[in-house]
Amino acid sequence: MSKKLWGGRFEKGTDKVVEDFHSSIRFDQRLYKQDIRGSIAHARMLGRQGIIAASEAEQIIEGLEKIMADIEAGRVEFDVAAEDIHMNIEKILTERIGDVGKKLHTGRSRNDQVALDVRLYLRDEITETGRLLRELITVLLERAEEHVDTIMPGYTHLQKAQPITLAHHLLAYVQMFGRDCSRLVDCAKRFNISPLGSGALAGTTFPLDRMAVAQELGFDGITENSLDGVSDRDFAIEFCGAASLIMMHLSRFCEEIILWSSQEFSFIELDDAYSTGSSMMPQKKNPDVAELIRGKTGRVYGDLMALLTVMKSLPLAYNKDMQEDKENLFDAVDTVKGCLAVFTPMIRTMRVRGERMKAGAKGGFTNATDVADYLAKKGVSFREAHEIVGKMVLMCVQKSVALEDLSFEDFRACSEAFEEDVFDAIRVERCVADRKVPGGPAPDAVKAAIQAARERLS
């Protein structure tokens, strides 16, 4: 006779190879807190509804609380033969309190049980991931305040484009990570409904109080269709999508950190604590943390694609394929949290070479647009001004000089609209200061943006 909790229908036990292949306890044991919390709420409801005796419910709850304490103290060894965290806990409970433990699963299936556990787990992890994102945003705002006047080149196509400030650049990432926070909040709102009571797929004949269990566990409501409650993992996929966007933003920032810390740019220097050396070349100081985050981005993309692929062809309701959701979800959670935890202090401690940034902003004709704008303000159409300045840039390239190095006679030869004030108008400091439009790099606009971001964060 099989000793499986589901073994009554079978004449012989599972092959050992199948047992090992089938078991998920190796990775789903991290759900023990959520599983026990859900079971306690379920047992309490069973007792309150008179489905089991109140004394039996209390005995089950007390047993589950002791199991929780023993797991946290490292006194529990899980059994591969019991398959998963749900069956392991029920097996331990029954061994400790006897046949009363067998009543815990009344009106419940592992299908709705695991759907509940994963929701509880993801809700906890979204809270922590959001905290890490807000910590990063706080650091970015602090660094932005330090560098409101630190001029640097802005780029398009990785070619110098227009002068901006480091604060303005950092605030772009504040916006991106702020949207990442919003996505996590939205994701949690959508899945914060309890599937418990959906049973295997068609609910149950027992008079369960689904709403009471949902409220005890902090859910906003219950799933409205038992098939949907157990058969979809769109909430896990949505999280992995949000996680992929977080990683994409981190990866873009890391790419810039890697470039900026190179000798060719030399805009920043990373703290020794967030750099590594070479086993052969003694002079090397490598931005390995940034490179590794950039590399791990593809890993999280892979987690998203794996979940989408698992779910793409599954008929309703539950299928064993869905056991494959957890490792990818857990990996995405761990990777994002790990990257945020190391990225934030790296940004907090990096040293900015402001003079080097400003020198970079003075090269590459970053003030060319301002020359065209100057002409437009003098009454020249912008398209004509664009043509004039393009020819001026070509002349400068041929002479190996900057626009501001041209003589006033050179300017007048290109257009009689130029006056002596052109030299002040095209200084990089003036180019930045004049961009006062909301969202622009002018110091006052940046300070307003920092204040607005702080208010959103509070």
From Swiss-Prot:
Molecular-function GO terms, alphabetical: argininosuccinate lyase activity
Cell location: Cytoplasm
Gene3D superfamilies linked to this entry: Fumarase/aspartase (C-terminal domain) (1.10.40.30), Fumarase/aspartase (Central domain) (1.20.200.10), Fumarase/aspartase (N-terminal domain) (1.10.275.10)
Reactions catalysed: 2-(N(omega)-L-arginino)succinate = fumarate + L-arginine
Regions crossing the membrane: none
Biological process (GO), any one: arginine biosynthetic process via ornithine
EC class (word): lyase
GO cellular component entries: cytosol
Pathway: Amino-acid biosynthesis; L-arginine biosynthesis; L-arginine from L-ornithine and carbamoyl phosphate: step 3/3
Keyword Lyase attached: yes
Keyword annotations of the record: Amino-acid biosynthesis, Arginine biosynthesis, Cytoplasm, Lyase
The EC number(s) this enzyme carries: 4.3.2.1
Similarity comment: Belongs to the lyase 1 family. Argininosuccinate lyase subfamily.
Protein name in UniProt: Argininosuccinate lyase
Origin species: Heliobacterium mobile
Taxonomic lineage from the root: Bacteria, Bacillati, Bacillota, Clostridia, Eubacteriales
